[in-house]
Amino acid sequence: MGTVHARSLDPLPMNGPDFGSHDDADLVEVEPQKKQEILENKDVVVQRVHFEGLGRTKDDLIAHEIGQVFKAKNLIEVMRKSHEAREKLLRLGVFRNVEVLIDTCEGEDALPNGLDVTFEVTELRRLTGSYNTMVGNNEGSMVLGLKLPNLFGRAEKMTFQFSYGTKETSYGLSFFKPQVGNFERNFSVNLYKVTGQFPWSSLRETDRGVSAEINFPIWKTSHTLKWEGVWRELGCLARTASFAIREESGHTLKSSLSHTMVIDSRNTSILPKRGALLKINQELAGYTGGDVSFLKEDFELQLNKQLAWDSVLSTSLWGGMLVPIGDKPSSIADRFYLGGPTSVRGFSMYSIGPQSEGDYLGGEAYWAGGMHLYTPLPFRPGRGGFGDLFRTHFFLNAGNLCNLNYGEGPRAHLRRLAECIRWSYGAGIVLRLGNIARLELNYCIPMGVQSGDRICDGVQFGAGIRFL
């Protein structure tokens, strides 16, 4: 009997395999010659799809993920669509392993060109644990987690996570529920407590909150609608905290609605070589309760272009504005901050803009832009291996952060944002840590320094996910 084995379809190129030039040609074992003609040169029909190893997973969940397999018309399409179905099944987060077997049909109703596709799956245990480390914006943390995957059989999961970092400690409980047949449409609820230390402001903040959010795609964009209610406790981190920080101390209750839209065509989020990113976020607080009221808008734009000699030119632009609603001024916990190795390099962490006695208070409006040139290391050491994780980095950054008088009008706002621009330039080395984070070691030359700014003239180290 002629049999086609496809137990691991990862090496299969999406444009169809070239059986004459790839190592995975031995995946096809055909006998006798008549069957070979049927499989290779004629249309085929997928008559049945079987699953082996299913336990608590519901049939309607997997039926949506494998529906395209039945539409395949030839052997190449069967293998490709089976590969795509395997990736979709793994993305659900309910299986530890998925293997595929493609075989000719047997039985009285078997067609001469009929195929059976069998998915051999291994479900995750009902309770799993994890231990790992994470890199944030110039901060590292240890993360312990417990997860209940596939809680009700339709890819739901409940997660408890504890994180201990250099500046922040948090724990939270979350529930995640995707829409059957459309994993990008999902709903989640989170309960959390976060305690953070912000030495640049001599501030300690503890947040206890609950949030609910819905994620969904529209055309080429992804959207998030979120409600968040949080009880915030602000306190002084040191006895030397300024009077402005002491005034901010106390308790506030924030209830806000937010919307985020993302368009992302980059090939990867860490050191992309091509593509663009546009992210726009709006937040409205006060209309659903709480004692904090404001409207907050911010955006992020990034463009990447691959050049000759494996070089990449990248440009980015950030901006935002916070408008208090009512008589109360904005809270230090809601304002924007700028400066540091992940934004305007050459300045200390969040040490640009309004300050009081050395404590930085943040601002209600900001912009920041950057231009970067990434090139391979000189002489390409370790090419094709570990050396490809490193890039040479040349950069030019600029930005400004300030408070606005909202009675002056837009022209006055733009004029103030264009005054006293901080900027810097330099060069360094970038290390990509997979698709998790990146590390930078740069030599920075800060320019446009204003009174009260804290600079980092010379070597500066940065670690994180989001960089200007």
Curated annotation (Swiss-Prot):
Q: Name one GO cellular component term.
A: mitochondrial outer membrane
Q: What is its main location?
A: mitochondrion
**Keywords per UniProt:** Membrane, Mitochondrion, Mitochondrion outer membrane, Transmembrane, Transmembrane beta strand
Q: Domain POTRA: where? A: 44-124
Q: Where in the cell is it found?
A: Mitochondrion outer membrane
**One Pfam family of this protein, by short name?**
Omp85
Biological processes annotated in GO: cristae formation
Q: Where is this region: Disordered?
A: 1-24
TM ranges are none
Membrane topology designation? Multi-pass membrane protein
- Which function does this protein serve? May play a role in the maintenance of the structure of mitochondrial cristae.
Oligomer and partners: Associates with the mitochondrial contact site and cristae organizing system (MICOS) complex (also known as MINOS or MitOS complex).
Per the entry's comment, what about the domains?
Answer: Its C-terminal part seems to contain many membrane-spanning sided beta-sheets, that have the potential to adopt a transmembrane beta-barrel type structure.
Instruction: Tell me its family.
Output: Belongs to the SAM50/omp85 family.
Q: What is this protein called?
A: Sorting and assembly machinery component 50 homolog
